[in-house]
Amino acid sequence: MNTTNAKKKGLSTETLVLSALMTSLVIVFQCLATYTTFFGPFSTAIGLIPIVIGAVLCGPVIGAWLGLVFGLVVMITGGANLFFAFNIIGTIITVVVKGSACGLVAGYVNQLLQKFNRTVAVIAAAIVCPIVNTGIFLLGCILFFMPYANEIANLLQLNVSGMAVFAALAFGNFLFEIGMNIVLSPIMVKIIEVAEKTFNRKGKKMAHAAQPVEAEAENSEENN
């Protein structure tokens, strides 16, 4: 095992640990969100916070995974029950795709911008995440639920029709979520900086500890 392989193994372990931690936080945060139904029948997506942090620290793929977990938690905790009553398949597709996509896009936005400025990259990822989440929700409503718009409006006692029904459902939560992410962005930056420094130190220690082992292995090969 050479130094490069050891380093790659260390980074892989770090990513695994961080993704497991962020997965746990997504589950906890979104379960807590069940009790934060401020606007309409939906809970607020506070699970987007660890999704952004995970996407920045671990990359777009882990961001997509965290978004998938977020979507599953939303469905399990009853956050999509209103739509399940009208179109089960459409609900599953919409919830899973919007969750995965918001984490994936947040990760790519961070990768694109971090070469210029880390703080700007994190803030941009935090803003893009709820935009993608809400945008795909509205797209899913158009594709799968437009025939039921008036029925949903009557059920929720909304004095609107057509696409305005779904816009009304999403608008309040969207403003809350994007505002929350913007306000918490500086905290996210600090958390990310601390996490990176911590794992960088551990990575250096692992690489340093591996050097004597590698030297001993090389000497053994030479003697043989």
Task: Describe these PLM feature segments.
Residues 16-20, 49, 63-68, 92-97, ...:
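Hydrophobic alpha-helical transmembrane segments
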Residues 29-30, 34, 106, 110, ...:
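Membrane-water interface at transmembrane helix exits
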Residues 30-44, 68-104, 108:
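Interfacial aromatic-anchored transmembrane helix boundaries in multi-pass membrane proteins
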Residues 132-157:
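Juxtamembrane non-transmembrane "cap" segments at the membrane-aqueous interface
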